[in-house]
């Protein structure tokens, strides 16, 4: 990431859970992670490399900086990588008529810890208290 100045984030979903799990395996240098995970490569607009074609949402992210955080363990490290999203790819079938993302159809996957995962299958709206119309529009990602 630091060498190329780019990285790609692919949304993990319930439907991709097996590929996500396979992608956690450390592979020998040069072995194709996409092939090993059983997913298809899609080209990026600027980032070198590829994104996961089966993922409903992908971000091409320009590298900003890395923070190397000590873990207290001489064998392992924790690196926090910070970037700026340069390009967002969203499959059309997951964009609702109002322009929002159909999260319930995507079923985003989240790791809870241990061997446990969950996915989004319920959603509710909760507006910020005492927010102005302009602030609420900003929270929705609008600029009007």
Listing of model-derived features with the role each one plays in the protein:
Residues 2-144:
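Basic, polyanion-binding surface patches
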């Amino acid at each position: 990431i630091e060498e190329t100045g780019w990285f790609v984030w692919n949304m993990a979903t319930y439907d991709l859970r097996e590929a996500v799990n396979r992608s956690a395996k450390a592979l020998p240098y040069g072995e194709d992670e996409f092939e090993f995970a059983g997913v298809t490569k899609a080209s990026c607009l600027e980032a070198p490399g590829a994104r996961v074609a089966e993922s409903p949402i992908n971000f091409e992210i320009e590298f900003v900086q890395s923070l190397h955080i000590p873990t207290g363990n001489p064998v392992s490290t924790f690196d926090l990588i910070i970037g700026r999203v340069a390009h967002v790819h969203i499959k059309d079938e997951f964009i609702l008529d109002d322009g929002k993302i159909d999260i319930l159809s995507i079923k985003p996957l989240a790791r809870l810890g241990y061997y446990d995962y969950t996915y989004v299958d319920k959603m509710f709206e909760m507006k910020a208290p005492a927010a102005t119309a302009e602030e609420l529009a900003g929270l929705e990602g609008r600029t009007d």
